[in-house]
Amino acid sequence: MNLGARVVIAGTHSGVGKTTVATGLVAALRRAGHRPGTAKVGPDFIDPGYHALASGRPPRNLDPWLCGAAAVPGLAARAADGTDVLVVEGVMGLFDGASDGTVSSTADVARILDAPVILVVDAGAMSASVAALVHGYATWDPEVRVGGVILNRVGSDTHETMLREALVPTGVPVLGALRRDDAMSWRDRHLGLVPVVEHPDVVKAALDRLADAVTAAVDLPAVVALARRPPDLSCPAVSLPSPVGPDLTVAVAGGPAFSFTYTDTLDALRAAGAEIVPFDPLADSALPAGVDGVVIGGGFPEVHVEALGANRPLLDDLARHLRTGLPTWAECGGLLLLSTELDGNAMAGVLPGRGRMTTSLTLGYRHVTTRTPSFLGPVGTTLRGHEFHYSALDPGGTDLDLRSRWGARSEGWATPGLLATYVHHHPGGDPGPVAAFTAACAAHRNHRAT
């Protein structure tokens, strides 16, 4: 596969409005007749939901640490398939990456994809100083090409003129200047923005307003011309699991409480031969009939904990199926759903831990090694993932060893029928875990049929 027109939307730091600008740009490009694809640098689940609403296409992630740098071009090409321009939103500041340097930073992905960068600057509290800021970012790394600037939160026409004049000596063109407008801001909470699935009508209304603003304030033809500047990039195909057999069905949790499942995870499950059957733990009274496995990703069960706890039919049915050995992969919010309780509300009770929300953030990439035999493989099986949560579970399990630069601990449950952990896994660079899970699902189906 080849990757054609592409551009990276980066920020000088977190909070400058990257997601607002990137999402508005995608919506404006689509309105102008383009077919934009999108991707998000890093493991984030929430921002890609905004991209998907704007583009009308499935969201994607690009993470060199989780997936390996070699997999990133292929994942980007998949995100760009059927589009005429790929818009990649960065993470944090342009050069901020994993704890071991700039790995998995926005700059890292821009280098890997040979993609030009548009730098988003919060210009609300500066004038001439913007030139020093942009010059520093544009010259820091010669392999990262800052091809333009979008000024955000500009106060007035006079303010915009001052900013544009200040930037002339840098040689970095101003591609747009967006006015300060609180009506175009997204709602947020403890893990970032509120997911689109929780308030789609509100987001759609704000997105329409944002698309109007970007269309009026950003030079869209110049953005597309910049994206078309690099030559096409040849991309190896992404590794996917081989089919394990026909007629395999896997239930995947969704809805407002469980929206953290990667598009690439769904693709990997389908490649392995699974039909995806969605279910909503808030609304459904039972698992879909006849499924061969269950995936319960993360989300915000803590926000909906009373409603989840009140849905005893679903929780009891889930517990009954798990006790018969139905292969289940539960991550973070899914782990909490299987616990005894969350903030005093009874959950499925499959696991002995009691969950509670805290004020301490657990965040970072993890090397994971199994300490017990499981559907993943024998003791010592490894995978990569990340954590991002404010909750705690006590007891929290001891079947997995998690290592990072800052230390190690044990957590989670890993058995022949269950993986329950705080760690989120992305299959883009390693299809093995999904292949192992679907093999366990097929074995369970065959055993049930005998």
Predicted region positions:
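C-terminal and late-domain segments of enzyme folds
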Residues: 110, 244-246, 259-268, 275, ...
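Internal gly/pro-rich beta-alpha loop/helix module
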Residues: 127-242
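Phosphate-binding active sites in nucleotide-utilizing proteins
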Residues: 247-323
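Cysteine-nucleophile active-site neighborhood
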Residues: 301-376
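ATP-dependent carboxylate-amine ligase catalytic core
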Residues: 2-113, 121-148, 157-161
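Acyltransferase
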Residues: 185, 198-246, 252-260, 417-450
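Beta-strand->loop->alpha-helix junctions that form or flank phosphate-binding loops
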Residues: 40-41, 174-182, 275-283
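Structural motif
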Residues: 8, 87-89, 118, 150, ...
